[in-house]
Amino acid sequence: MKRTYQPSKIKHQRRHGFRARMATANGRKVLARRRAKGRQSLTV
């Protein structure tokens, strides 16, 4: 049986990247929360 996490940089960026966050209202809320918290990196 293979492991469940088979990392792919492209899929990771498309789902969790900055442009993916900016594409939806809720994604922008995520970025706003992370900015307010003072996160060094907003997205992966």
From Swiss-Prot:
Q: Name one GO cellular component term.
A: ribonucleoprotein complex
Superkingdom of this entry's organism?
A: Bacteria
From the UniProt record, which GO molecular function terms apply? structural constituent of ribosome
Return the annotated region ranges for Disordered.
Answer: 1-44
Compositional bias per record (Basic residues), positions renumbered to this chain:
1-19
Gene3D superfamilies associated with the record? 1.10.287.3980
Q: Which UniProt keywords apply?
A: Ribonucleoprotein, Ribosomal protein
Annotated transmembrane regions: none
- Establish whether keyword Ribonucleoprotein is in the entry: yes
Family of the protein in this entry:
Belongs to the bacterial ribosomal protein bL34 family.
Q: What is this protein called?
A: Large ribosomal subunit protein bL34
What phylogenetic lineage does the species belong to?
Answer: Bacteria, Bacillati, Mycoplasmatota, Mollicutes, Acholeplasmatales
